[in-house]
Amino acid sequence: MDIKLKDFEGPLDLLLHLVSQYKVDIYEVPIVEVIEQYLNYIETLQVMKLEVAGDYMLMASQLMLIKSRRLLPKVVEHIEEEDLEQDLLEKIEEYSRFKAVSQALAKQHDQRAKWYSKPKQELIFEDAILQEDKTVMDLFLAFSNIMAAKRAVLKNNHTVIERDDYKIEDMMASIKQRLEKENVISLSAIFEECQTLNEVISIFLASLELIKLHVVFVEQLSNFGDIILRKEKR
């Protein structure tokens, strides 16, 4: 079973997406939280054996440096640390401006194209708008946080034997069966019962497939918050 998630245009695009969730000025966002979100996303891609481009890894190393310096006891002011943060935020702000201009030009192009050709009919699951204006990528970012927490828990369990034969179809059937009884379930509650990371990943992919097929409905009421599955649409 192949699962394709909408990719970002680059590390700055991912950072801009994370920063925009706070709905405050770029220079007022909690930078350590943003860095942790970014690193969780990259780590989850690696665990799921999805390809991670080199520029994402380069940015990850820079962010880890900023985070480590942020968390160190401050005996003296670190001018270099402030410069790194300032430089990062300026890059995100500059990228935001360029992206806004690019989107405006693309919109004008699409409007002109309507006069000359019939627009292609295409359904892109990755871009589907979910309840509360959330996208599948928002769910994946939330899943990245859950995955990071679950990995920390499983590290303390040395008796677990990993399996790689979890079937997505079986997980889909299990979720549907559970929804028949409970009507509403949270993915975090399901993940708590999982014994391996492979099981967690399989359940998440099964959930995405059920959402794609409109068998279950999903909502996420807060940024990076829990993922709620419903039997019926609200």
Curated annotation (Swiss-Prot):
It is found in: Cytoplasm. Keywords: Cell cycle, Cell division, Chromosome partition, Cytoplasm. Gene3D superfamilies: 6.10.250.2410. GO terms for cellular component: cytoplasm. GO terms for biological process: cell division; chromosome segregation; DNA replication. It comes from the Bacteria. NCBIfam families: PRK00104.1-2. Participates in chromosomal partition during cell division. May act via the formation of a condensin-like complex containing Smc and ScpB that pull DNA away from mid-cell into both cell halves. Belongs to the ScpA family. Component of a cohesin-like complex composed of ScpA, ScpB and the Smc homodimer, in which ScpA and ScpB bind to the head domain of Smc. The presence of the three proteins is required for the association of the complex with DNA. This is Segregation and condensation protein A.
